[in-house]
Amino acid sequence: MKNVLITGAAGFIGSNFVRYELEKHADWNIVVYDKLTYAGNLDNLKDVAEKFGGRYRFMQGDIADREAVFGCVKDNGIDLIINFAADSHVDRSLTEPGSFIMTDVYGTYVLLEAAREFNIARFHQISTDEVYGDIEAPGRSTEEDKLHGSSPYSASKAGGDLMCLAYARSFNVPVTITRGTNNIGPFQYPEKVVPVWVTNAIDGLPLPMYGDGRQMRDYQYVLDHCEGIDVVIEKGALGEVYNIGSGIETRNIDLAHAILDLLGKPYSLIQTITDRPGHDRRYAIDNSKARELGWQPGHTFAQALEKTVRWYLENESWWRKIKSGEYLAYYKKQYAGREI
């Protein structure tokens, strides 16, 4: 059996990844280590605990807590560390940059120290295409491009990536990194654009859109991303970075239209608001390096979005529980008074 530590896996992508891996790898025992911040939710893993209880364990903790991390790795005989733990919302990074640095840079350092101390067989870092910054068409960011994080979030993730590569070179820690594009799918906390717009549209509420809505993003289905990560962990070369994304670019305005069309709602629900400071106009990656390992995306944009919208329609109790209390206060603070 392989003992795997997956940090931050009570969140969106991590919880989907845990489910994917337990179904695929009968020889994996998984320890989920999560701080359970506002976006961490054990409801995301409820079915996992019920179905895979013998091979799944949850521990609450902060990756920046060296003593707790080292104890977790040692006590569970960890062979593989996969780091999903991150503060990940750009808007929050503009008001709380310190927490992003603590988790995304210092927390990554602590995990790397644990990997070094206990001779972990593989350390895999989950990163983002946002570390490249925006890129003019028709260019696409490759793994060799310089990092130009333009928000505290992307800068902190870039710092974590560089720390991983430094540990690979300086201390021979067996590191791989994947940089994923925007994910959509089940269990995404409704502060990100797709679940915000889908759940608002279901209730007939405005869809807040930054600026002219012509920002370009690559949206991929979360399980395609999970498969890509798995392939890189199994086949990727140590010390290397791999971009994971659909390769399909979509403007935010077109995303809003597609969501409203799927729900049969009017375009008049789109509400233009003042743009985000330093908002990147276009992200686009070259995913050919991951494809060379045998991975390829399994969903078109239309398929991914339809599955996502259907999931939120069928799981209202999940997101309605979240869209109350602290969330309402955050939403009002983020969007109130910004209408154009």
Say what each PLM segment does:
Residues 39, 66, 187, 191, ...:
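Loop/helix-junction capping segments adjacent to catalytic residues or to phosphate/diphosphate-binding pockets
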